[in-house]
Amino acid sequence: MRDVEGAIRFLQTAFPEFRARGEGKSQDGSRWVHIGTDETYIALSPAKAEPGKHWMPYRGLPGVNHLAYEVDDVEALCARMKSAGYKDSTPPNAHPHRKRRYFYDLEGNDWEFVEYLSQNPTERNDYKLPDR
């Protein structure tokens, strides 16, 4: 992560309830921030050097393709993200048991947000039905 403040803005746009619940300096003097709620958080710290090649998700290279989070209202989240200028990267999808939206943060990391339309785990986690 090159821009910790940018990541914090992205996460607080997606999750308005997120706050910096702790921060400090690591042994090498670099800043770290825990952003989230009292129950869960994401640990952020800056990269020490610029990578030789900018990583892009879904290209078969080492790295995280995307992180996914369950939300109660994916359309409200989508409106917040677009209003804040984040790029929608949602692939076509029309699953009967979930709504998914994807957004790139300012560093090109892809984040998935899913609203489940069923309480049944088998239906929620079905990957055989085609997304149209």
What is each residue range found by the language model?
Residues 1-3, 21-23, 33-36, 54-132, ...:
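Vicinal oxygen chelate
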Residues 1-42:
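Core segments of cupin and vicinal oxygen chelate
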Residues 1-9, 64-69, 117-132:
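N-terminal beta-strand motif that seeds the catalytic metal site of vicinal oxygen chelate
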Residues 20, 50-55, 121:
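A short, acidic/glycine-rich surface segment
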Residues 25-26, 49-50, 73, 94-96:
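Short beta->alpha connector loops
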Residues 38-42, 48-51, 74:
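Short, charged/polar surface micro-motifs in flexible loops or helix N-caps
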